[in-house]
Amino acid sequence: GFLDKLKKGASDFANALVNSIKGT
């Protein structure tokens, strides 16, 4: 559903943000 997609999008965004901060 829409909320599942939204949750996944937020999760992916958070992971990308963490990775960019770590620089790895």
Swiss-Prot record:
One of its GO terms (biological process) is defense response to bacterium. It is found in: Secreted. Keywords: Amphibian defense peptide, Antibiotic, Antimicrobial, Immunity, Innate immunity, Secreted. One of its GO terms (cellular component) is extracellular region. Expressed by the skin glands. Belongs to the frog skin active peptide (FSAP) family. Frenatin subfamily. Very weak antimicrobial peptide since it does not show activity below 100 ug/ml against Bacillus cereus, Escherichia coli, Leuconostoc mesenteroides, Micrococcus luteus, Pastewella haemolytica, Staphylococcus aureus, Streptococcus faecalis and Streptococcus uberis. This is Frenatin-4. It comes from Nyctimystes infrafrenatus (White-lipped tree frog).
